Amino acid sequence: MPEEHEHTASAVGGCLCGKVRFEVHGELLSVVNCHCSKCRRFHGNVGAYTSTQRENLIMIRDEGLKWYRSIHDETPNVHRGFCKACGSSLFWDPKEKKNISIAAGVLDAPTNLKTSRHVWVDQKGDYYEITDDLPQNAGKFERANGENQ
């Protein structure tokens, strides 16, 4: 990775095998835990996402990056990014919005992020309980800036 990027990135992350690496140059929003059936299938459990403006995401290595267009999501025209080599679930990209969501677990530590809420709790799996006091939404959550997660 070029040295000039190391000092300007607010976050760095990537997949398990290293064939996808990226930097975020800008603000990352708080983590939102998505309990919808699509995120649970994509991640194998709850989808924990942060997000940033699309132009803040800089791909350093993307030879493994593959996009799946999810036509059955509640949000139309969503693309889910994953590594085709190792299978890591990486991105949730609603093309009509200005932000792209990044799976919080693929960010290198320390992230300094905090979880702020749960969404789509009406679809949560029956094999776990939500035991914190964070706000819960039955459906999607619209941030003040109009972005949803």
Roles of regions detected by a PLM:
Residues 1-149:
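A short Gly-Trp-Pro
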